[in-house]
């Protein structure tokens, strides 16, 4: 039986968002009877208590930097990518399927290593880095164009790119849109506490902190009690009245937190519209809570409106169908492109 290898920087017991999605895809594939390996590094991003998702999890050795230290982070990115390349050379066989997430970003260069093994390659584009780095440094437009050409050249080498939203940059020729989904279930309807608002998650390079603080201020003026649970560099920039609490690391408490609040805040950056689409939105949709989105503009607003109608309970099935097609074809994956409005 051919193996599906899913490679991402952080895996269980860590709880980075990309890792959570990777493990839930792996668990579904294992449930369907497929041979699957979840492969990641040994670094730490975020804690969340949960049981082991699949039987076969491989943790690779690599340099581990300090989160928040850019030099160390980039060194870790390169080290993880080298470890992935070594893993591909040693363990990937002809006709296997290799799914690689955009964490770390350097993994965009791994398509040729997978092709040399005679396997099919799928790149899971959670973040489009030529645009995302603008949150760190607003580099000149000509340089941006050069970086995009370089990145898109490497993206074009993959048999298939899976974008999590129609707003993400990158080539379209080999791309399909399969959106993310709620990472937890909300089976029992629960009424929220009135006039409560919650931000829960990362505040990083793709977020306009000033716009988020302004929205929180308007809610506070309207009588809402605003709870801020966040990590990342943006958390350091919050005013004293919005000082963040730690993120919940117990899934039951996190679920209760999401259900208890009437309004969920989601942040973006209006200058950076092709880099990300916030995955936390899907838990809000599933919990049936009100959304207050800050920094959404252009393509992100369009993607938000599409996502409100998207059948998120089918998104994992779209993934398994795509992988089944890749495994059953003797050639690179040729499934029909899923149009953004229909994904």
What label would you give each PLM region?
Residues 207, 250-256, 264-285, 292-303:
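Nucleotide-sugar-dependent
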Residues 189-207, 213-216, 227:
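Conserved donor-binding/catalytic core segment of Leloir-type glycosyltransferases
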Residues 1-51, 160, 214-223:
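N-terminal subdomain of nucleotide-sugar transferases
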Residues 230-258:
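Nucleotide-activated donor-binding/catalytic signature segment of Leloir-type glycosyltransferases, i.e.
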Residues 176-195, 208, 330:
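Acidic anion/phosphate-binding donor-loop and adjacent secondary structure
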Residues 42, 164-167, 178-181:
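Carbohydrate-associated surface elements
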Residues 79-84, 89, 97-117, 123-126, ...:
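An aromatic- and histidine-rich active-site surface loop
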Residues 106-109, 113-116, 129, 141-161:
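Membrane-proximal helix-turn-helix segments that form the acceptor-binding/catalytic region
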């Amino acid at each position: 039986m051919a193996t599906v290898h899913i490679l991402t920087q952080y895996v269980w017991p860590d709880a980075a968002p990309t890792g959570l999605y990777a493990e839930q895809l792996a668990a579904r594939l294992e449930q369907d009877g497929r041979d699957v390996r979840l492969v990641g590094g040994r670094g730490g991003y975020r804690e969340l208590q949960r049981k082991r998702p699949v039987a076969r999890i491989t943790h690779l050795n690599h340099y581990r930097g300090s989160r928040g230290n850019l030099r160390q982070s980039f060194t870790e990115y390169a080290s993880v990518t080298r470890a992935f390349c070594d893993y591909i050379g040693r363990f990937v066989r002809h006709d296997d399927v290799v799914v690689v997430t955009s964490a770390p970003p350097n993994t965009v260069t791994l398509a040729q290593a997978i092709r040399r093994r005679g396997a099919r390659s799928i790149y899971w584009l959670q973040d489009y880095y030529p645009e995302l780095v603008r949150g760190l440094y607003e580099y000149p437009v000509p340089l941006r164009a050069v970086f995009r050409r370089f990145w898109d050249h490497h993206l074009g080498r993959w048999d298939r790119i899976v974008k999590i939203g129609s707003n993400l940059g990158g080539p379209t020729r080999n791309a399909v849109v399969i959106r993310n989904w709620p990472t937890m279930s909300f089976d029992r309807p629960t009424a929220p506490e009135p006039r409560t608002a919650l931000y829960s998650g990362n505040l990083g390079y793709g977020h306009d902190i000033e716009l988020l603080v302004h929205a929180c201020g308007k809610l506070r003026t309207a009588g809402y009690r605003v709870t801020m649970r966040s990590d990342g560099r943006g958390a350091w920039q919050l005013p004293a009245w919005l000082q963040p609490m730690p993120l919940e690391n117990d899934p039951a408490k996190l679920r209760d937190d999401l259900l208890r609040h009437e309004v969920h805040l989601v942040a973006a950056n209006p200058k950076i519209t092709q880099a990300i689409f916030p995955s936390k939105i899907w838990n809000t949709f599933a919990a049936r809570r009100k959304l207050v989105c800050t920094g959404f503009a252009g393509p992100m607003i369009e993607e938000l409106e599409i996502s409100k109608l998207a059948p998120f309970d089918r998104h994992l099935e779209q993934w398994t169908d795509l992988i089944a097609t890749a495994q059953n074809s003797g050639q690179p994956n040729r499934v029909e492109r899923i149009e953004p409005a229909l994904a």
